[in-house]
Structure formats: C-alpha cells, structure tokens
C-alpha cells in the first residue's frame, strides 16, 4: 500500500485520468473528491462489497486494494 500525505486542496493523480482531491478534514473524517472518466467505477468500499455480494461474486482484490 502506498501511503501519501496531502493537505486540504491538494490533489493526487491515479494514472492519467483520475484525480483525488482532499476537500476538507474535520476530526477523524476526511472529505475527498474524485474525478474519473465515466467508464471508471468509483465506490466506497462498503458499497462495492454490497454490489459484489448482490452479483454473487467475490472481489478479486483484498478489501481496500481496489
């Protein structure tokens, strides 16, 4: 796992087309914004796991590694 430190307003790039921006921090919560092409699915982990369970499949990656 790559661990990065970012401040509010700073962005990181994933590949050429996906950006993740830190929008705010309050206590132990971090608000992030994700910009990605429509063909790239972006889900919170618990939603992704629910989608996979409804499909009857298990995720190929370990939780948190997708």
Curated annotation (Swiss-Prot):
Gene3D superfamilies: Translational regulator CsrA (2.60.40.4380). GO terms for cellular component: cytosol. Its main location: cytoplasm. One of its GO terms (molecular function) is mRNA 5'-UTR binding. Keywords: Activator, Cytoplasm, Repressor, RNA-binding, Translation regulation. One of its GO terms (biological process) is positive regulation of translational initiation. It is found in: Cytoplasm. Homodimer; the beta-strands of each monomer intercalate to form a hydrophobic core, while the alpha-helices form wings that extend away from the core. A key translational regulator that binds mRNA to regulate translation initiation and/or mRNA stability. Mediates global changes in gene expression, shifting from rapid growth to stress survival by linking envelope stress, the stringent response and the catabolite repression systems. Usually binds in the 5'-UTR; binding at or near the Shine-Dalgarno sequence prevents ribosome-binding, repressing translation, binding elsewhere in the 5'-UTR can activate translation and/or stabilize the mRNA. Its function is antagonized by small RNA(s). Belongs to the CsrA/RsmA family. This is Translational regulator CsrA. It comes from Aliivibrio salmonicida (strain LFI1238) (Vibrio salmonicida (strain LFI1238)).
């Amino acid at each position: 796992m790559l661990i990065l430190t970012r401040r509010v307003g700073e962005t990181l790039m994933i590949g050429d087309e996906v950006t993740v921006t830190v929008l705010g921090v309050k206590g132990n919560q971090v608000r992030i914004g994700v910009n990605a092409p429509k063909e790239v699915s972006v889900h919170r982990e618990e939603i992704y796991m629910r989608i996979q369970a409804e499909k009857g499949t298990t995720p190929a990656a370990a939780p948190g590694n997708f």
